[in-house]
Amino acid sequence: MANVPITSLPQASTVAKTDQLILQGSSTQRATLAKVLSDLSIVNPDMAQDTMLRIMVPNGAGAHNATFRGKNLGGSLTSAQAAQISAGTFQDLYLGDYWSIGGVNYLIAGFDYWLNTGDTPCTKHHVAVIPQNHLYTAAMNETNTTEGGYAGSQMYKTGLDQAKQTLTNAFGAAHILNRRECLANSVSNGKPSGGGWFDSTIELPSENMMYGSHLFAPASDGGTIPQNYTVCKAQLPLFRLAPQYSFTRASWCWLRDVVSVTAFADVGSDGSAGYNYASYVGGVRPVGGIC
């Protein structure tokens, strides 16, 4: 083949990955097409999904909040995973991925969901996690009242203690995101009328986080404009891409929104949006950040 122009050779009608190619650098060598595709990270149908995602999805929260995978990440948060979260790169972590710890699947529901929020800004990169099913059942209050709002409820004061301990045991205290959250702490005529800033780790989610909008929580009616005491104004990205994860068939679950003088919002076990009297016992399916 010496001194034969490559353009004078016949053109191949088909190409296989086992075909041999001539490579010329410091020396003349040969390589299969499959080797070239692999070494140059060229996306092709035979590429493993994880490899393809690493090539196609850029590092950072924006792209990862738009990519669903649903992979089991193992039985613990590894040092490599923690490093990716801390750096805000989130490589090999995607929506719907989950850690299976102590019989609970903790789903990744969003990346940097609370970043820069709060009266004191949240500056740590993090993933928002939520258990696939409720952890246990409890009432919002002993009686049918929403007095004091979510921050004044029995659920907020003591009912989440078990959830906080469960997530701390699963991920370690050093990896639980501590941030600032605005919460309703007073109610007038069945509508939130006051709020304040609180240190926050593990909370009940809100209607906004589940659905992307208020459904039963009070909203502007042309006469009154209720204040939304929250920084959680956007839907968790997981539920936008895979809404089947927004509810659990095992139980209806509490949300933190005040609906009336007697009821808080909930997510139905059939996927519906609803509300229930504060003394009713429903599922506790909390959300928190891992950093």
Regions found by a protein language model. Name each.
Residues M1-T18, C291:
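Short, intrinsically disordered N-terminal pre-domain segments
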Residues R54-C291:
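Collagenous Gly-X-Y triple-helix signature in extracellular proteins
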Residues N3-Q11, T32-L33, V43, T78, ...:
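Short, solvent-exposed coil/turn linker segments
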Residues K17-G25, Y106:
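Extracellular disulfide-bonded cysteine-rich modules/repeats
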Residues L23-S41:
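Short, surface-exposed terminal/edge motifs of secreted or surface/virion proteins that either
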